[in-house]
Amino acid sequence: QPPIEKDVNDKAEATLEARDEEFTYHVKTKIPYEATAFNITDTLKDVLDFSGEKGQAEATVDGKKLSDDHIAINGQTITVTLNQEELKANADKEIKLTFKAKIREGANLSDYIEKGKTVINNQASYNAAFPNDPNFHKDSNIVPVTPPNPENPPIEKKVNEAESANLGARDEEFTYTIDTTVPLDVTGFAVYDTIEKVLEFSGENGQASATVDGQPLDASHITIKGQKITVKLTEDEAKALGGKAVHVSFKAKIKAGANLSDYIEKDGTTRIYNTAKYNFNNDPGTEQSSKPVPVIPPTPTEPELKKEVNGKEAET
C-alpha cells in the first residue's frame, strides 16, 4: 500500500525563531487501489493548536481542491475523508492535506524536553478498508518542531517601592518587594531572600504575602527559616502558571542593638544590601538574582563627652 509522508514548512523538521510562530504541516499519500473507505488523520499534541479557523486547512486530490466538507476537526484531530465514488474515480492519485498550527499560548513544554532541547513530534496516518483487510492503518514519518528555549525572566527587588531606602530612624520598619515571572516550561519554582544578619523580619512571619497573576497565594506557600524567606509553587502550579507575574512582599527592620560597623562604606555611609533570587526545577544551577537593594539607616549621633569636677564644670 502507498506510503504516507509528512513535512513541516516543506522540510523534515522545523526550528522556530519564536515560540508563537505559525508553522505549516503537509501530509501526502496516494489513494489506494480497491479501497472502499479512506481517511487521513493527524492528531496534534496537546501543547499545539490549529492556527486560524479550522487550521486554515486545505485538501487536494491530483492538485484539485476538495470542498471544505471533506475536512473535519474534532479536538486535536484533523481528518480528511473521501467517499466510495471519489475513491474509485481517483485511485492512485495524490491526496494532500495542508494545515497550520502553533504552540498553544501558556503551554508548558517540560514533558518535551530531552537533553536540554525541546522537541514536539507529530505524525500523520491514513486508515483504509480493503476487501481482504477492512482495518488497514499506516503511519507517516515523525516530524519534529523545535521552539527556541525560553529566556529566564528578570527578578527585581525594591525597598519601600524604590531602589534604596533612607531610614528616618534606626528602628524604622521597611517593606521589601520582589517581582518576577514564573519561567516557561518548568516543573518547580521558588523565590527566596536571605536577609542580612543585622536585620530581622518585622511582625509575624514578616507580614509576608505573595500573589501570582494578581491572585493571592495561601500562607502554605510561604516559609521563613532563620533569615530566609521562601515562596514556593507546587509542580502543578509551576506548570500551569508559566509566564504569570509573581509579587512577594514582606517587612523587616534593623535588629535592636545590632552592630553595623561591617556595613560602613568608604564614604562613611552605612548601607545594608539585600538580594532576592529564584530558581526552578529544584536546581540551584538555574538561580537568578536581583540587583542588590540598600537600606541606609541614619548615622548615629556621637554621645556627648562631658567632664566635671566635684559636680561642677570647674573648681577653685
Model-derived features with residue positions:
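Extracellular/surface recognition and adhesion modules
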Residues: 6, 27, 40, 99, ...
